[in-house]
Swiss-Prot record:
PROSITE patterns: PYRIDOX_OXIDASE (PS01064). This is Pyridoxine/pyridoxamine 5'-phosphate oxidase. Substrate binds at residues 60, 117, 121, 125, 185-187. It catalyses: pyridoxamine 5'-phosphate + O2 + H2O = pyridoxal 5'-phosphate + H2O2 + NH4(+); pyridoxine 5'-phosphate + O2 = pyridoxal 5'-phosphate + H2O2. GO terms for biological process: pyridoxine biosynthetic process. FMN binds at residues 55-60, 70-71, 76-77, 99, 134-135, 179, 189. Its EC number is 1.4.3.5. One of its GO terms (molecular function) is FMN binding. The gene is pdxH. Its cofactor is FMN. Pfam families: PNP_phzG_C, PNPOx_N. It comes from Myxococcus xanthus (strain DK1622). Gene3D superfamilies: Electron Transport, Fmn-binding Protein, Chain A. Pathway: Cofactor metabolism; pyridoxal 5'-phosphate salvage; pyridoxal 5'-phosphate from pyridoxamine 5'-phosphate: step 1/1; Cofactor metabolism; pyridoxal 5'-phosphate salvage; pyridoxal 5'-phosphate from pyridoxine 5'-phosphate: step 1/1.
Length: 206
C-alpha cells in the first residue's frame, strides 16, 4: 500500500465507543472520495478442506446488527458460508488511507429483506440471478445467453420473482479493526472486540 499519507493521529482517549457509527462516518467519507463502488469489499470464507477463498462483492446494507451482501446461495461463497458460518470482510479506501476489517458469524437475512432488495435491482440483474448457475462450469458464453433468453421469455411482461437460491448474508461482527496509514509504516490500528453485549477497544502495534 504505497500512498501519500496525510498526518493523522487518533489517541486512545479519542477512540469512538461505537464501531458501527465510526464505520458509518468513514463510509460517508469514502463515498465522497471514491466515484466507483466505494462499497466494494473483500469477503473471505472457508471450505470443508480448510482452504480460504476470497472475492470482491458489494456491501448493500449495514446497521448495528451487521454487514449485508447478497448472492446465489449455491455459489462457492454461499455454500461455504452456510457450511461454515463465519466470514471476514475487508474494505480498503486508498484515497482516505483507511482500511477496515470485520470478522464474525454469518446469518441469512430474512425473506422480507431479500425480497425488498431483489425488487430494487435492475431487471437484467434479476434475470441473471435465475439464469446463472453461479460458480458452476460453463461450456460457452452462448450457453449462458441462451439461459438468459429463456428466463426473459418466461417472465415477459411480468415481474421477476426472487429465486429461492438467491438471498443475502449478514456478517454479525465480533471483531472490527480500523487501520490508518502513517509514515514509516507506523500505522494506527484500533480493534473493537465484542464483549458482554458491548465493545472493548484496544490499540494494536502496527
Amino acid at each position: 500500500m504505497h500512498t501519500c499519507r496525510a498526518p493523522f493521529m487518533l489517541h486512545r482517549v479519542m477512540i469512538p465507543p461505537d464501531p458501527i457509527q465510526r464505520f458509518a462516518e468513514l463510509f460517508e467519507r469514502a463515498k465522497q472520495a471514491i466515484a466507483v463502488d466505494p462499497n466494494a469489499m473483500v469477503v473471505a470464507t472457508v471450505g470443508d478442506d480448510g482452504r480460504p477463498s476470497a472475492r470482491v462483492v458489494l456491501l448493500k446494507d449495514f446497521d448495528a446488527r451487521g454487514f449485508v451482501f447478497y448472492t446465489n446461495h449455491e455459489s462457492r461463497k454461499g455454500r461455504e458460508a452456510r457450511a461454515h458460518p463465519y466470514a471476514a470482510l475487508c474494505f480498503y479506501w486508498q484515497p482516505l488511507n483507511e482500511q477496515v476489517r470485520v470478522e464474525g458469524r454469518v446469518e441469512r437475512v430474512t425473506d422480507a429483506e431479500a425480497d425488498a432488495y431483489f425488487q430494487s435491482r435492475a431487471r437484467g440483474s434479476q434475470v441473471g440471478a435465475w439464469a446463472s448457475l453461479q460458480s458452476q462450469p460453463l461450456a460457452t458464453r452462448e450457453e449462458l445467453e441462451a439461459r438468459v433468453a429463456e428466463v426473459e421469455q418466461k417472465y415477459a411482461g411480468q415481474p421477476v420473482p426472487r429465486p429461492p437460491h438467491w438471498s443475502g448474508f449478514r456478517v454479525v461482527p465480533d471483531r472490527i479493526e480500523f487501520w490508518h496509514a502513517q509514515e514509516s509504516r507506523l500505522h494506527d490500528r484500533h480493534v473493537y472486540l465484542r464483549e458482554d453485549g458491548g465493545w472493548r477497544t484496544q490499540m494494536l502495534y502496527p
